[in-house]
């Protein structure tokens, strides 16, 4: 879908109006005859997760406002509602989403890197970052480059993110890890 306004129209008084941007996009989406929200709901009417691709590159969007960068967030907190609940439209509820640039920085003719998509959508699915910062604000990279939830999202300039780690697969309920004791032989 396309909105009828430019990104710069969603900035007012220095504030990003992300809630307005996302709500307007959802309202247009649910009116489309091709939209079938039930395809995206595991239970009931809550759409399990979705992605907003804003036009152009992240660098260009950041020149409009410092918050136009790839991230994951929730409709209940972004200003789209006044009651801190999921946004309602077309009989469906919308909450967790990723917000990404459509085009690649430095190569605007290319679609954005898969690594950033995989990282941010993994947040929508419930995974957390595996990097942080120390008390001085310095990056603590985590298991980079072997993990998409840390710096692995940038492998091969973001084109080849790693597979999910055992920790992430277990966190999602996809596998059960076996804990070994010190006296067990491992083959």
List where the protein language model places each region.
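Extracellular hydrolytic enzyme modules, especially secreted metalloproteases
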Residues: 49, 55-187
């Amino acid at each position: 879908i396309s909105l009828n306004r430019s990104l710069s129209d969603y900035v007012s008084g220095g504030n990003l109006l992300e809630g307005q941007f996302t709500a307007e996009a959802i309202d247009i989406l649910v009116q489309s005859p091709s939209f079938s929200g039930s395809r995206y709901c595991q239970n009931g009417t809550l759409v399990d997760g979705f992605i907003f691709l804003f036009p152009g590159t992240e660098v260009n969007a950041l020149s409009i406002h410092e918050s136009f960068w790839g991230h994951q967030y929730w409709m209940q907190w972004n200003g789209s509602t006044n009651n801190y609940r999921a946004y309602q439209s077309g009989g469906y509820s919308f909450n967790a989403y990723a917000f990404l640039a459509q085009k690649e920085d430095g190569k605007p003719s290319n679609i954005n890197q898969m690594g950033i998509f995989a990282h941010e959508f993994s947040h929508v699915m419930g995974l957390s970052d595996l990097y942080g910062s120390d008390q001085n604000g310095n990056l603590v990279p985590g298991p980079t480059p072997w993990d998409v939830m840390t710096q692995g999202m940038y492998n091969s300039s973001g084109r080849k993110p790693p597979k999910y780690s055992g920790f992430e697969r277990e966190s999602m309920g996809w596998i059960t890890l076996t804990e070994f004791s010190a006296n067990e032989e491992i083959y």
